[in-house]
């Protein structure tokens, strides 16, 4: 076979001529300040628009290039008062797009070099280590952040922290300011890598590399001064800052930057913004394509309702794009569009921080031209970029056309070096200036597609997780031979997102008598650690004898070799042996299904959880099998249908998740021999683990379904108990005072865990009750080492707004949207409770009512239970204090996050030690939902560990 030729668009020696796309003016800028200046002078009335994390579409803030220039120049002039030398690195740690854009340009105009800091780790030790590393790397510690960011790094000494709010306050008019004039090869912007193989590296991009990339992108995208783009990627990512801001700015294009929470929380927001703003270019990762498709493909009520004629191209990157997902998304857009003949171009691309984001693209109408492979091809390089695939062993020998190998790229958009790290820089390039991407690619007929990864990360829904960190934790699992474990990224055929496989050598022989029990316990522990760290269990866990785990000459286990053996079927005998032993272990504890009710329930469990009914045991637990809050609702609905019952109370499923126990309860319902159970607020959602239990108090909706998804992350770590309000069951009276609630819950906690130390937390309304329980326990002489207050201010419990309570409950049940809560509240307050319930019922999606098996009477009763709690809190006034407190806060529904944090800090008056205030993803109503619970649990568990629990 003939070696594959290097694929390029233009020779390197004429790249400078190619930096002038036909649609750019002849006076092409050579530095970033030139880009900014030209955009302002040539397109003064073109616009930058922003939607923050705390406002809705109607609160979009728009500013002209001219107005933005004045603000930036004023900030730059104020920055000079810091008296830093030209070229000083300023770490920018901000949340909102508008703040980031202004801060970066102010740094550039004042002669400083901005370094964009992504969200810091919730693990205190990791966060402190990272910040210290950055400080040493730059030989300085100047940070520009907001109050929330300052709060996160306040415990780290030696930092020179400047608040953006104070910088804005000190900024003057800025008219006399003379902007810094850099050279094209000066450092422009630094970007931090994910740190997946250690601490982050700082990627140095000069004015020249950034402008080369932006010219090439603009030419590829067909950008003009009349283009309109929409971006939701964070500004700390090269795709958000370079690809979707500086490149369009180079062409004078107007831009809309939307906080990611606005897109993820409302799938229709993406389409509405395209329609309302005539967006021509947008970005959507494979994860978002899949989510939007799932949420919208069955919304036949919206078919033909959106004017999507403006959108010319949707870029997709960050992870491989599944071809079937892209096609389903395009079909969904076609159905939703007013023009039934509309076509939609999805452009999968390849890029890295080191290449200024995308540098290889393949624009395709996936409905007219069906993709040839499981994942979309990534296409050909942009102008000036070259790519090749080589033998990964030597890094230089070209692979034949159609064969996989290490993907390498070169061109003027490739970074110049890693800041203060010559060793890493040197190892990243080979002779000829080729950059080693770390990805496995195939070039066939001039087009590139990826077939895997060499580098040590796994990408889950577009988020990169470090394989070395995962391996470090897995090495500590009992049953794993230390240093004989490797984890490697792997995407199974048909799987939408990347997964991973774990290879390890057991500390015990697989032929020993106790091997089944030990292997089962080891694999359960490996799954638990994996879910907690990267939100995903392994696709396969493969035990391999030590003498068959070959090492390289450097003493390392070769992930690439192990994955190749796995793909080739060479490890099949080890996989089969593991299945056999685990089957024996399950058989030892296996209890055969003995009654018709158990068999029927087992069938429902199997369908819901996608398991084989033949493997179901009578002692299987819904939650230990991976059941979620949605699965509880499905089990309730399917069970009521199967047994012809008017209702199986949700609380009974929560309290009886084991098949045999639930079967006995169902039998009692069928025979109408149900003995009335005494009210007990404790709902055990997870009972495994030896660490201090966590008690979680319900929010204002009174129920605990919202905690089901969270509880599973504590398996084999600590028991998780939820507290549910009184009044759901027939004959149960409502609570009448806060004191009654606290006395009842405290007694239940003491019955469940007689002695401290205790860990108590509450979500929203429950945060206030948790605070009162902690006070009561301390008054009884017990130690409370953790008091968690989740997103509620100290005096909120007394705010007796029954209308808002009804709407909040309705939102949590999926009956109304988050937007409806604020929109409907004013007009609903004058209505009677009956009229309010009727209005909510009319607004509720019929399919959701069927799914919940909800009737007007059930909704009314639920609302009454919730309302009774609000009535209890109407005279509540916080007093006294607890020894420790952790306050978790999300994005508010209105106003800034800083203002919300300021209100929350009143909790400081009620703690005898300085409380910790912890920023969590999502909004008040979504922080524990499916999209956010994985990140919330990591943050929450980190705080428990920080408190010594």
UniProtKB/Swiss-Prot annotation:
Record family assignment: Belongs to the ATP-dependent AMP-binding enzyme family.
Pfam name, any one: PP-binding
Assigned keywords, A-Z: Phosphopantetheine, Phosphoprotein, Transferase
Keyword set includes Lipoprotein: no
Domain of life: Eukaryota
Disulfide bonds: none
Signal peptide start and end residues: none
pH dependency: Optimum pH is 6.8.
Residues where O-(pantetheine 4'-phosphoryl)serine is found: 629
Any Gene Ontology biological process: biosynthetic process
Region (Thioesterase (TE) domain): 693-934
Protein name: Inactive atromentin synthetase invA3
Region (Adenylation (A) domain) location: 38-460
Temperature dependence: Optimum temperature is 20 degrees Celsius.
Domain (Carrier): residue spans on this chain: 592-670
UniProt-listed InterPro entries: AB_hydrolase_fold, ACP-like_sf, AMP-bd_C_sf, AMP-binding_CS, AMP-dep_synth/lig_dom, ANL_N_sf, ATP-dep_AMP-bd_enzyme, PKS_thioesterase
Location of region: Thiolation and peptide carrier (T) domain: 597-667
Membrane-spanning ranges: none
UniProt function note: Inactive atromentin synthetase homolog. While the invA3 adenylation (A) domain is capable of adenylating 4-hydroxyphenylpyruvate (4-HPP), the invA3 enzyme is inactive because of its non-functional thioesterase (TE) domain.
One Gene Ontology molecular-function label: acid-thiol ligase activity
């Amino acid at each position: 076979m003939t070696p594959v030729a290097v694929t390029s668009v233009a020779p390197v020696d004429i790249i400078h001529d190619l930096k002038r796309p036909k649609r750019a003016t002849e006076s092409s800028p050579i530095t970033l300040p030139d880009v900014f200046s030209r955009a302002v002078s040539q397109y003064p009335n073109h616009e930058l628009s922003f939607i923050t994390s705390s406002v809705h579409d109607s609160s979009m803030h728009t500013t002209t290039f001219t107005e933005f220039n004045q603000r930036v120049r004023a900030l730059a002039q104020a920055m000079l008062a810091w008296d830093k030398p030209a070229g000083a690195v300023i770490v920018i740690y901000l949340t909102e797009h508008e703040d980031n854009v202004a801060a970066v340009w102010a740094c550039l105009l004042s002669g400083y070099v901005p370094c964009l800091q992504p969200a810091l780790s919730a693990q205190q030790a990791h966060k402190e280590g990272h910040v210290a590393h950055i400080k040493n790397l730059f030989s300085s510690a100047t940070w520009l952040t907001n109050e929330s960011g300052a709060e996160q790094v306040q415990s780290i000494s030696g930092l020179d922290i400047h608040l953006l709010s104070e910088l804005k306050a000190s900024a003057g008019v800025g008219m006399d300011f003379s902007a810094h004039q850099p050279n094209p090869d000066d450092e422009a912007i630094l970007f931090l890598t994910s740190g997946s193989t250690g601490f982050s590296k700082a990627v140095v991009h000069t004015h020249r590399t950034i402008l080369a990339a932006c010219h090439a992108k603009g030419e590829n995208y067909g950008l003009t001064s009349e283009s309109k783009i929409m971006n939701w990627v964070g500004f700390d990512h090269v795709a958000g800052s370079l690809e979707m801001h500086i490149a369009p700015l180079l062409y004078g294009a107007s831009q809309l930057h939307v906080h990611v929470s606005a897109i993820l929380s409302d799938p229709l927001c993406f389409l509405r913004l395209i329609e309302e703003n005539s967006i021509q270019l947008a970005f959507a990762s494979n994860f978002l394509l899949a989510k939007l498709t799932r949420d919208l493909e069955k919304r036949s009520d919206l078919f033909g309702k959106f004017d999507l004629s403006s959108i010319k191209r949707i870029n997709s990157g960050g992870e491989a794009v599944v071809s079937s997902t892209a096609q389903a998304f395009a079909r969904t857009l076609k159905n939703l569009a007013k023009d039934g003949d509309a076509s939609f171009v999805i452009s999968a691309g390849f890029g890295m921080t080191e290449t200024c984001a995308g540098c290889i693209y393949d624009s395709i109408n996936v409905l007219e031209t069906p993709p040839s492979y499981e994942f979309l091809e990534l296409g050909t390089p942009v102008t000036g970029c070259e790519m090749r695939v080589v033998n990964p062993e030597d890094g230089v020998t070209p692979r034949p056309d159609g064969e996989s190998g290490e993907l390498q790229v070169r061109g003027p958009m490739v970074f110049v070096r890693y800041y203060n790290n010559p060793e890493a820089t040197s190892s990243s390039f080979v002779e000829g200036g080729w950059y080693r991407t770390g990805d496995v690619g195939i070039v066939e007929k001039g087009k590139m597609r990826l077939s895997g990864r060499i580098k040590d990360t796994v990408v889950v829904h577009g988020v990169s997780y470090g394989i070395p960190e995962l391996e470090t934790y897995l090495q500590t699992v009992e049953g794993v031979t230390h240093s004989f474990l490797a984890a490697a990224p792997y995407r199974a055929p048909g799987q939408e997102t990347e997964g991973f496989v774990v290879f390890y050598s057991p500390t015990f022989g697989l032929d020993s008598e106790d091997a089944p029990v030990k292997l089962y316990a080891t694999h359960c522990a490996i799954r638990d650690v994996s879910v907690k760290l990267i939100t995903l269990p392994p696709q396969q866990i493969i035990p391999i004898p030590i003498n068959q785990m070959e090492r390289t000459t450097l003493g390392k286990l070769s992930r690439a070799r192990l994955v190749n053996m796995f793909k080739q079927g060479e490890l099949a005998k080890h996989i089969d042996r593991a299945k056999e032993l685990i089957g024996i272990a399950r058989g030892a504890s296996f209890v055969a299904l003995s009654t018709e009710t158990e068999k029927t329930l087992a069938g429902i469990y199997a369908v819901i959880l996608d398991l084989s009914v033949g493997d179901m045991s009578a002692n299987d637990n819904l939650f230990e099998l991976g059941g979620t809050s949605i699965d509880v609702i499905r089990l309730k609905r399917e069970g009521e249908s199967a047994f012809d019952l008017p209702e199986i109370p949700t609380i009974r499923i929560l309290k009886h998740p084991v098949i045999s126990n639930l079967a006995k309860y169902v039998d009692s319902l069928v025979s109408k021999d149900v003995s009335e159970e005494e009210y007990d607020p404790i709902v055990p959602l997870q009972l495994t683990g030896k660490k201090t239990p966590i008690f979680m108090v319900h929010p204002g909706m009174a129920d605990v379904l919202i905690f089901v998804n969270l509880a599973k992350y504590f398996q084999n770590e600590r028991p998780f108990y939820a507290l549910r309000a009184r009044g759901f069951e027939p004959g149960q009276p409502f609570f009448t005072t806060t004191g009654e609630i606290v006395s009842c819950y405290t007694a239940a906690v003491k019955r469940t865990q007689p002695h401290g130390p205790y860990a108590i937390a509450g979500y929203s309304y429950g945060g206030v009750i948790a605070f009162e329980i902690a006070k009561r326990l301390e008054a009884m002489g017990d130690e409370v080492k953790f008091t968690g207050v989740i997103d509620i201010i100290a005096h909120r419990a007394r705010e007796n707004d029954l209308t808002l309570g009804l709407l909040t409950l309705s939102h949590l049940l999926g009956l109304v949207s988050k937007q409806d809560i604020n929109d409907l509240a004013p007009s609903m307050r004058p209505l009677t409770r009956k009229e309010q319930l009727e209005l909510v019922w009319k607004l509720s999606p019929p399919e959701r009512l069927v799914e919940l098996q909800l009737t007007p009477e059930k909704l009314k009763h639920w609302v009454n239970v919730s309302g009774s709690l609000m009535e209890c809190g109407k005279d509540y006034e916080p007093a006294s204090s607890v020894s420790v407190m952790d306050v978790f806060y999300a994005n508010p529904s209105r106003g800034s996050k800083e203002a919300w944090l300021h209100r929350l800090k009143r909790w400081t008056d009620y703690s005898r030690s300085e409380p910790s205030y912890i920023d969590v993803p999502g909004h008040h109503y979504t922080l524990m939902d499916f999209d956010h619970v994985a990140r919330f649990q990591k943050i929450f568990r980190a705080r428990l560990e920080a408190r010594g629990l």
